[in-house]
Curated annotation (Swiss-Prot):
Identification of the protein by name: Brassinosteroid LRR receptor kinase BRL1
Chain sites annotated for binding brassinolide: 678
Placement of sequence motif Cys pair 1: 69-76
Source species of the chain: Oryza sativa subsp. japonica
Gene that encodes the chain: BRL1
Keywords: ATP-binding, Brassinosteroid signaling pathway, Cell membrane, Glycoprotein, Kinase, Leucine-rich repeat, Membrane, Nucleotide-binding, Receptor, Repeat, Serine/threonine-protein kinase, Signal, Transferase, Transmembrane, Transmembrane helix
Record bears the keyword Transmembrane: yes
LRR repeats: 106-130, 132-155, 157-177, 178-202, 204-226, 227-250, 252-276, 277-302, 304-327, 328-353, 355-375, 377-400, 401-425, 427-451, 452-476, 478-500, 525-549, 551-572, 573-597, 599-621, 650-673, 689-712, 713-736, 737-761, 763-786
UniProt-annotated binding residues for ATP: 918-926, 940, 986-988, 992-995, 1038-1043, 1056
Length: 1214
């Protein structure tokens, strides 16, 4: 049948298109191609440091030149075509704003490779004109940004490979040609969910798809469209939710590599279907939130696996499986960072024929390594650290694995003589030995290096090794890291070790080493980065050779007996980040050249004998510290809060391989009753050019004025200049220290007033100007009124909150500290007080003797009663040595309770039995007590109390007991008995908001929106009262829904105010989360400064408000994975999905939906990442007031705002 004319025309057109596509393009002049390449060079290459494009010159190669085919990096097709077919400029260090127009105009260009340069800019201009012959494009490892335009490479119909990895691309997308086989967009900043979904929907022919290390969020799409994929990598993104059921079961048959590590995937995978994994060789599901009571048995179908990684899920538990024995191809098995328990199965040793790496670290495994592991003849890396293994398996089993290169057994319970000799004899290839944090003793073998010539790392910290450091360690020519800290070593540091040519880390702190530090540092190379030999007994001076070590990052010589001055030349150490010379006997001047160290963020010179003035040049590096991680080493910071008892603001330790409980025994900790320990893995990360963050020059003999230039250090968090002889005024420029958390200027001779600008320092949580000659009012703004009076003591000219009001004459005339008249009056007053006290003491002695005689007969009866107290509850009692405990009175603040005793509390709680226990938290256990008169109270028994700080406890209780407000839970009384501390509170019928919202089974009432609104405003009112109306002002420090209690009328009562500060003074080793609050409520800035502020309370209140709006918990792995409520809400708002935030039970009334959005807006303002942009609690109340103006209800009932206080009766508060 003849075709119709239109069809014939169309067929002819298609034929013509095919012919044109297949026919060679008409040749273009060589000069035109050269001009295009030169145009690219002019537009894109601003810097060519190595002259890589020097050959790009017309006429190069002589008269018969084939330019540009003879140019470096340019390849042409063979004759007769002869056109440019490839441009490869990879790794040439070229820099400039990339413009691809000219290159994409080359019609025969098939391969473009610009990998590993410094090109920047975006690709919005990159739109090749058809026909496009490109087959491979690689622009990876540059600095591109912006979004991918839809037109990017769109006309390239034969494109097979695109690599844009390791840039800064943020989103966008481009249509895939059906010919595409490989796409690598890894290590960018891609967050576009559309691009993610499009990548999975358009990957029909793609075999290699790598989207790892981006910012993709949401759920993982199905793989159904990716029928040809062999490698899929979406690791290290922000994806969440459960895994798609068919991810493996219906995966393409060719899939060999699947990596979803480092996301927030959750859910139980114990029954997950692995039916489609027959050809998988690599499976990595590590570092998610997956759970199972065993390793998923479905994995038995994946018998071709060569790599299986399930580390870091933390919820995988149970015994290690034995079915892995059948995995004959397995070469790497990593199950670290989970909750696996029990012994290591003997059967696992049977799969060792080919296994190269085995990582079972950070679980809860017990016992020893089975003898069957001696068969692991290919094993090179064995990591069993962070378990509870014991026994002599190192000598009997590990030492027989001759192929071993890395052995990591730290943080176990291995005891006995250190096994280095048998390891050296049996494992000659060892490069890494890590036996830290065990209980090994004995000496370090002297001939280690002759047996282990390849040894790179010797890590033996936190053991009980003794003897001396053998000089023969200097024969380990490849040794890079030595860590012998926290042992019992004595003697000198051998010069041979100092001379090691490749040494990077030399860490030997907390031993008994002595002598002088050899002055041969970096004499055989400049590789040394870490020199931490603090807290030994070194004498002599700081070696001058230290200034040759130009790669030094961390230097800690503190806690020794070094003398002399700091040698010149430190200013040359441009990589130096941490310098600790504190607690020595150093003298001379503080080196001004330290301000030339552009990376210096931590300078601690406290407790020496430095004299002279503070050099203004120290601030010279402000704004010069480059962005990025300054130090990636593990650290511990011991924050000192003991004032004059322990000098300095705190101590930073290198903390690799040390148990926290061992550190707690360290003299710097247990001699300081108010020291806190914080740990981390990085010291600081700057997003912009930064400055020093820690500067401690306290306890020296510095004189002169404080340089105003220190105010330029905008990232400074700790500044301690206390206990010197400084004079002059506090610089006004200190108001620019926007990151400051601790500022100590105490015990100097400063005069003048406190600059009002210091009130604007939102992070300031520790401020001490006591013992100076300051005058004038304490600024009423910001944090300054929240500090106790002791921080302003002995400045007789200061006034205002928390001191007496200005205009109030002090008892001895208000003369400045040191005034002769003032001293005479003080002496006279002291004599009178002394006489009166003597008389009083005599009277008390007579009364006490009489009482002792009367009570002696009943003591045994009373003691027997105490010993018979029930012990069925969780409470424990420390009453040894307490006389007459039952008759101890409860100090009360309410008249009806004035005759309450400890015996009454025992009776009302049945000896604090489990039946009366109604709750427990970070500060203690709470019991319900019904007194004889029928009244009901709640009794909190404090935990973490060490018996120290009696005066602080009493003073704090007396302060808290006087605070009365209808939205605060009143403290009715307190009792001290032995080492125990009891607090008596008013009982709240409906319990905590946390239970009512999140535990439906225990909740006594259901909260509708009107009730939640009432609670939101009531708790805000209580918090605002603490911040603005109490004297001194109080920071809550642990605001959360479990500290919002509900009374009979469902009125909110904020509880535990003042408790965090009290426990801060009593407990010596609280965790970071206890100090700062509760996870999920902690403001982001706390992890920079470890300081609590009123704006931190505002953030925590914002979380409570989100709980009321959403009904969700702040942290819930089943809802948010590794994210939290705040992060989830911010993501919902960003994606215009705010309606999904609200509790479904609140959205029934459409008329009230607009109000929910208004309350959500207030919550988001409270949760701003920048503290200075959060409202105060007074401003929050004002916003609530504004919302109520058009409302029929009046749940704010009379609330009014004055200049600085809250008043609920219409009269200005004190």
């Amino acid at each position: 049948m003849a075709a119709s004319p239109p069809f014939m025309a169309a067929a002819a057109f298609l034929t013509l298109v095919v012919v044109l596509f297949r026919a060679p393009a008409p040749a273009i002049a060589v000069g035109e191609e050269a001009a295009a390449l030169l145009a690219f060079r002019r537009a894109s290459v601003a810097d060519d440091p190595d002259g890589a494009l020097a050959s790009w010159v017309l006429g190069a190669g002589g008269a018969n030149s084939t330019a540009p085919c003879s140019w470096d990096g340019v390849s042409c097709a063979p004759p007769p075509d002869g056109r440019v077919a490839a441009v490869d400029l990879s790794g040439m260090s070229l820099a400039g704003e990339l413009r691809l127009d000219a290159l994409l105009a080359l019609p025969a260009l098939q391969r473009l490779n610009l990998r590993g340069n410094a090109f920047y800019g975006n690709l919005s201009h990159a739109a090749p004109s058809p026909p496009c012959a490109l087959v491979e494009v690689d622009i990876s490892s540059n600095a591109l940004n912006g979004t991918l335009p839809p037109s990017f490479l769109a006309p390239c119909g034969v494109l097979r490979s695109v690599n844009l990895s390791r840039n800064g691309l943020a989103g966008g997308g481009f249509p895939f040609a059906p010919s595409l086989r490989s796409l690598d967009l890894s290590r960018n900043r891609l967050a576009d969910a559309g691009l993610l979904n499009y990548s999975f929907a358009g990957c029909h022919g793609v075999g290699y798809l790598n989207l790892s290390a981006n910012l993709f969020a949401g759920r993982l799409p199905e793989l159904a469209a990716c029928s040809a994929v062999t490698t899929l990598d979406v690791s290290w993104n922000h994806m969440s939710g459960g895994l798609p059921p068919g991810l493996v079961a219906t995966a393409p048959a060719n899939l060999t590599y699947l990596n979803i590590a480092g996301n927030n995937f959750t859910g139980d995978v114990s029954g997950y279907d692995f039916g489609g994994c027959a050809n998988l060789t690599v499976l990595d599901w590590s570092y998610n939130g997956l759970s199972s009571t065993r390793l998923p048995p479905g994995l038995i179908n994946c018998r071709r696996l060569e790599t299986l990684e399930m580390s870091g899920n933390k919820l995988l538990s149970g015994a290690l499986p034995t079915f892995l024995v059948g995995f004959s191809s397995l070469r790497r098995l990593a199950l670290a960072g989970n909750e696996f328990t029990g012994a290591i199965p003997v059967e696992l040793g049977q799969l060792c024929g080919r296994i190269v790496e085995l990582d079972l670290s950070s679980n809860r495994l017990v016992g020893a390594l089975p003898a069957s592991f001696a068969k692991c003849k290919s094993l090179e890396v064995l990591d069993l650290g962070g378990n509870q293994l014991a026994g002599d398996f190192v000598a009997s089993v590990v030492s027989t694995i001759a192929s071993l290169r890395e052995l990591r057994l730290s943080f176990n319970n291995i005891t006995g003589v250190n096994p280095l000799p048998v390891l050296a004899a049996g494992c000659p290839l060892l490069e890494v030995i890590d036996l830290g944090s065990n209980e090994l003793d004995g000496e370090i073998m002297p001939d280690l290096c002759s047996s282990l010539p390849s040894l790179r790392k010797l890590l033996l910290p936190n053991n009980y090794l003794n003897g001396t450091v053998p000089p023969s360690l200097g024969d380990c020519a490849n040794l890079e890291s030595i860590d012998l800290s926290f042992n019992l070593l004595v003697g000198k540091i051998p010069t041979e070790i100092i001379r090691l040519p490749k040494i990077v880390d030399l860490v030997m702190w907390a031993n008994g080493l002595s002598g002088e530090i050899p002055d041969v540092l970096c004499s055989n190379g400049t590789t040394l980065e870490t020199l931490v030999i603090s807290y030994n007994n070194f004498t002599g001076s700081i070696p001058r050779s230290i200034t040759k070590c130009v790669n030094l990052i961390w230097v800690s010589l503190s806690g020794n007996r070094l003398t002399g001055s700091v040698p010149g030349g430190f200013g040359k150490l441009q990589k130096l980040a941490i310098l600790q010379l504190n607690k020595n006997l150093l003298s001379g001047h503080v080196p001004a050249e330290l301000g030339s160290c552009n990376n210096l963020i931590w300078l601690d010179l406290n407790s020496n004998s430095f004299t002279g003035t503070i050099p203004p040049q120290l601030a010279g590096q402000a704004g010069l510290v480059p962005g990025g991680i300054v130090s990636g080493k593990q650290f511990a910071f011991l924050r000192n809060e003991a004032g004059n008892i322990c000098p300095g603001a705190g101590v930073l330790f290198e903390f690799f391989g040390i148990r926290p409980e061992r550190l707690a025994e360290f003299p710097a900790v247990h001699l300081c009753p108010s020291t806190r320990i914080y740990t981390g893995t990085t010291v600081y990360t700057f997003t912009n050019n930064g400055s020093m963050i820690f500067l401690d020059l306290s306890y020296n003999g510095l004189t002169g004025t404080i340089p105003g230039s220190l105010g330029n250090m905008m990232y400074l968090q700790v500044l301690n200049l206390g206990h010197n002889e400084l004079n002059g005024t506090i610089p006004d420029a200190f108001q620019n220290l926007k990151s400051i958390g601790a500022l100590d200027l105490s015990n100097n001779q400063l005069s003048g007033g406190i600059p009002p600008g210091l009130g604007g320092l939102n992070f300031l949580a520790d401020f001490d100007v006591s013992n100076n000659n300051l005058t004038g009012p304490i600024p009423s703004s910001g944090q300054l009124t929240t500090f106790p009076p002791s921080r302003y003591d002995n400045n007789n000219g200061l006034c205002g909150i928390p001191l007496p009001p200005c205009g109030h004459n002090p008892p001895w005339g208000g003369r400045p500290r040191g005034s002769p008249d003032g001293k005479r009056k003080v002496i006279g007053a002291s004599i009178l007080v002394g006489v009166a006290l003597s008389v009083l003491i005599l009277l008390l002695l007579l009364v006490t003797l009489c009482k002792l005689r009367m009570n002696q007969k009943t003591e045994e009866v009373r003691t027997g009663y105490v010993e018979s107290l029930p012990t069925s509850g969780t409470s424990s009692w420390k009453l040894s040595g307490v006389r007459e405990p039952l008759s101890i009175n409860v100090a009360t603040f309410e008249k009806p309770l004035r005759k309450l005793t400890f015996a009454h509390l025992l009776e009302a709680t049945n000896g604090f039995s489990a039946e009366t226990l109604i709750g427990s938290g970070g500060f203690g256990e709470v019991y319900k007590a019904k007194l004889k008169d029928g009244s009901v109270v709640a009794i909190k028994k404090l935990i973490h109390f060490t018996g120290q700080g009696d005066r602080e406890f009493t003073a704090e209780m007396e302060t808290i007991g006087k605070i009365k407000h209808r939205n605060l839970v009143p403290l009715l009384g307190y009792c001290k008995i032995g080492d125990e501390r009891l607090l008596v509170y008013e009982y709240m019928k409906h319990g905590s908001l946390d239970v009512v919202l999140h535990d439906k089974a225990k909740a006594s009432v259901k909260l509708d929106w009107s009730a939640r609104k009432k609670i939101a405003i009531g708790s805000a009112r209580g918090l605002a009262f603490l911040h603005h109306s109490c004297i001194p002002h109080i920071i809550h420090r642990d605001m959360k829904s479990s500290n919002v209690l509900l009374d009979n009328n469902l009125d909110a009562r904020v509880s535990d105010f003042g408790m965090a500060r009290l426990m801060n003074a009593l407990d010596t080793h609280l965790s970071v989360s206890t100090l700062a609050g509760t996870p999920g409520y902690v403001p982001p800035e706390y992890y920079q400064s470890f300081r609590c502020t009123t704006k931190g309370d505002v953030y925590s209140y914002g979380v409570v408000l989100l709980e009321l709006l959403s009904g969700k918990k702040p942290i819930d792995p089943t809802e948010f994975g590794d994210n939290n409520l705040v992060g989830w809400v911010k993501q919902m708002v960003k994606e215009n999905r705010s309606s999904e935030i609200f509790d479904p039970t609140l959205t029934d009334r459409k008329s009230g939906e607009a109000e929910l959005y208004q309350y959500l807006k207030i919550a988001c303002e409270c949760l701003d990442d920048r503290p200075n942009r959060r409202p105060t609690m007074i401003q929050v109340m004002a916003m609530f007031k504004e919302l109520q103006l058009d409302s029929d209800s009046d749940i704010l009932d009379g609330f009014s705002i004055n200049s600085s206080t809250i008043d609920e009766s219409g009269e200005k508060s004190m």
